[in-house]
Regions:
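Enzymes and membrane/adaptor proteins characterized by extended Gly/Ser/Thr/Asp/Glu-rich
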Residues: 26, 34-123
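Boundary/entry segment of secreted carbohydrate-active catalytic domains
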Residues: 1-29
Length: 123
C-alpha cells in the first residue's frame, strides 16, 4: 500500500509537475510505457482503444511501474466499448435518456463500470 499522504514530500519537483499530466499514449510497447513513466512521471493516462487483453496488459504494466497509482481514463458513457473495442455497447446517453427509465441509466453505468474496471480503468 502506498502512503499517498507522505508521498509528495518525497517527490522531486519534476515528479510533482508530472503528476499534473495525462499521457495520450499511442503505443502499448512495454519499453515505451516504462520510458513515459520514468521520463515524465505522469499522473494519468488515456490510450487508443484496443482489445480487452491488450488494454489490460498495458494498464498492468503502467500500474506496476508507476511510483504512484495512475488514473487510467476510459470513455464509457455508452458502455464498456469505450474502455476496449470488444466491450459491450449499451447505447449513448441521449438514447438512454429518451427511454425515461432510470433502470436503463443504472444498467449503462453498471455495465460500463464493471467492464472498465476489469481491464484496469479507474477514471
Amino acid at each position: 500500500m502506498v502512503n499517498l499522504k507522505a508521498k509528495p514530500y518525497n517527490m522531486s519537483i519534476e515528479e510533482k509537475i508530472g503528476q499534473l499530466f495525462v499521457n495520450m499514449g499511442a503505443s502499448r510497447d512495454e519499453e515505451y510505457l516504462k520510458s513515459v513513466l520514468n521520463n515524465y512521471h505522469i499522473g494519468a493516462v488515456r490510450y487508443n482503444p484496443g482489445k480487452a487483453e491488450e488494454v489490460y496488459e498495458q494498464n498492468r504494466i503502467l500500474q506496476e511501474n508507476s511510483k504512484i497509482p495512475l488514473l487510467i481514463a476510459a470513455n464509457t458513457e455508452a458502455g464498456g466499448n469505450g474502455a476496449c473495442t470488444d466491450g459491450t455497447y449499451v447505447g449513448n446517453e441521449v438514447k438512454i435518456a429518451a427511454t425515461q427509465d432510470p433502470h436503463y441509466a443504472y444498467e449503462l453505468g453498471r455495465i460500463s463500470g464493471i467492464e472498465a474496471s476489469a481491464i484496469g480503468c479507474n477514471w
